Amino acid sequence: MKILLIGPPGSGKGSVSELLTKNNALKHVSTGNLFRAILKEDSELARKIKEINVSGGKLVPDEITNQVAKSAIDELIKNQQSFILDGYPRTINQALALEQYCDLDYIFYLDINHQELMKRLTGRWMCPKCAGIYNIHFKKPQVDGVCDNDQATLYQRADDHEDAVSIRLDEYDKLTLPLIKHYKTNPRFIKINANQPIKDVYEDINNYLKQNK
């Protein structure tokens, strides 16, 4: 089973993916996580990504993104492992590259309004140890500024600051909205209301998967 979750930053792709992977024996493929892992390396690819200023909200070019994503996806296909794609593809060129070697079974579009996006993104804080995600509006830690799991001090990523969020959403509108139009003609395209709580978004998708196996 090969699933794509598509939607703007803050629509809940990562959180929904985590819930789905726990209950459906799926692997979570997040280009964001892949890039963060690469940035910890001392490699030419890491240096190229750093030069792009990802923390400032800019997207990594298609050529590099396709290379990183294909490496991860090829390995899963080789091992016949079901997976969820989160954050890839984001552009028409990326989608066309993916279609060369991967036939998606489900394409879930997380539809959400701009006001809710800003609330979610600018209120998001993360744990540096376990990568746990909190939000000051609807998913607060038990102790302000402290992770529930390991008591590490939470931090806000640079790309979750208001200025960077605005840049990310502008980039999304420019590059990813055409991608949604591309996928809308696909019979495997399913629109999900992502303005509702993450748990309800997950339930909608999980129920759809159960009913359409």
Swiss-Prot record:
Gene3D superfamilies, sorted: P-loop containing nucleotide triphosphate hydrolases
Keyword line: ATP-binding, Cytoplasm, Kinase, Metal-binding, Nucleotide biosynthesis, Nucleotide-binding, Transferase, Zinc
Localization of this protein: Cytoplasm
Region LID: start-end pairs: 123-160
Record: residues binding Zn(2+): C127, C130, C147, D150
Residue numbers spanned by region NMP: 30-60
Family of this protein: Belongs to the adenylate kinase family.
Protein name: Adenylate kinase
Organism the protein comes from: Ureaplasma urealyticum serovar 10 (strain ATCC 33699 / Western)
